[in-house]
Amino acid sequence: MHIEARLFEFIAGFFFLTALLYGVLTALFATGGEEWAGTTALALTGGLALIVATFFRFVARRIDTRPEDYEGAEISDGAGELGFFSPHSWWPILIALSGSVAAVGIALWLPWLIVAGVMFILSSVAGLVFEYYLGPEKH
């Protein structure tokens, strides 16, 4: 996880530097003054990358060194169970559709569609979380 953390720290630094340069250059050369939307978007993108980098740093401290993190690793060092994955689940598709409904409601500013989208999102996430606790797949 150290490599991933370094990668996202580099990305965060790049976006912060780009936001600073963009803000200064638009303030100096743009006819309407500084363009705040782009500066804010670049700064927030850097902030999101920094959040991911910080998460990877915390995870790297908690777990043992992975085969990906040292040079002398063999392919067989990474063998083993990776976790449980649900290959037949339809819930992620429903979550995406629900998010689309909410996004269209926000874009068109239709409060009833926003509420419907949020309700669909909550019910879809509940379905995903409880997928293996209800119904025929119950373990």
From Swiss-Prot:
Pfam families: Cyt_c_ox_IV. It is a multi-pass membrane protein. This is Probable cytochrome c oxidase polypeptide 4. It comes from Mycolicibacterium paratuberculosis (strain ATCC BAA-968 / K-10) (Mycobacterium paratuberculosis). Belongs to the cytochrome c oxidase bacterial subunit CtaF family. One of its GO terms (biological process) is electron transport chain. Keywords: Cell membrane, Membrane, Translocase, Transmembrane, Transmembrane helix. It comes from the Bacteria. One of its GO terms (molecular function) is cytochrome-c oxidase activity. It is an enzyme of class 7 (translocase). One of its GO terms (cellular component) is plasma membrane. Associates with subunits I, II and III to form cytochrome c oxidase. Part of cytochrome c oxidase, its function is unknown. Its EC number is 7.1.1.9. It catalyses: 4 Fe(II)-[cytochrome c] + O2 + 8 H(+)(in) = 4 Fe(III)-[cytochrome c] + 2 H2O + 4 H(+)(out). It is found in: Cell membrane. The chain crosses the membrane at residues 10-30, 36-56, 78-98, 101-121.
